[in-house]
Amino acid sequence: MARVSRLDPALSGVRTGLIIFDALNGYLHSDSAEKDAFLAERNIIPNMQRLLEGARKVGMTTFYPSGAHADDGSDTVLRLTDTDMDLGVGGSADKPIKPRFTKGSKAAEIAPEIAPIATDVVIPKRRWNSFHQTDLDLQLRARGIDTIIICGGSTDVGIASTLFGARDLDYGIVVASDACYSTRGDNNKFFMERVFPRMGRVMGVDACVALMTA
């Protein structure tokens, strides 16, 4: 018997969930004027807002995987790396790489412009991959969701790691390209053009919203 395809190009509010990854104050409202300008030039927050508004209009549940590390770093494994996150000098025994924002801090709160409402689901996480030892997979499957739209940052770190996890769990993938970002060179462009198209669909917010109501 032939296998019946369940592929559907539309993004229905029933079968699709929106994932807003690490939309924290510390990332979206940093103490770096240069980074804030970078995000503003690319309309990252307004694009995330438009995507969230579109999802809510069709009753789509939104999930917020958000870093929630212990203040003392006890839930983070120290590791030796060739470089730090910005390709500078790496971690060492006397200079370990620790979480940037810790649970309970203002920086670890979700940015107010895209704050969750009562029907949304906040997923505390302690690793890049939002599915790793969290209940994100359970929360999605319990609602009958088989496709995810993802936005946030950083594209080359948590977004990529989460999408590799989603693919291994057989979720359909849509990447909202103009609502994702990386401040590290051309990493965002590389993933959007060379990696993610092999895993799912890459499109702008306007196209995502249009498919939500298709």
Write out the residue ranges for each language-model feature.
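A short glycine-rich beta-strand->turn/loop micro-motif centered on a GG-aromatic cluster
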Residues: 149-153, 170-185
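Active-site acidic carboxylates
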Residues: 1-117, 199, 211-214
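Short acidic-hydrophobic, aromatic-tinged amphipathic segments that line or gate anion-handling sites
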Residues: 123, 200-208
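Hydrophobic beta-strand scaffold residues
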Residues: 62, 173-175, 202
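Glycine-centered short loops/turns at secondary-structure junctions
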Residues: 57-60, 144, 170
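Short glycine/serine/threonine-rich phosphate/pyrophosphate-binding segments
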Residues: 156-162
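Internal catalytic-core helix/loop-beta-alpha segment
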Residues: 100-148
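Active-site-proximal loop->helix
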Residues: 183-196
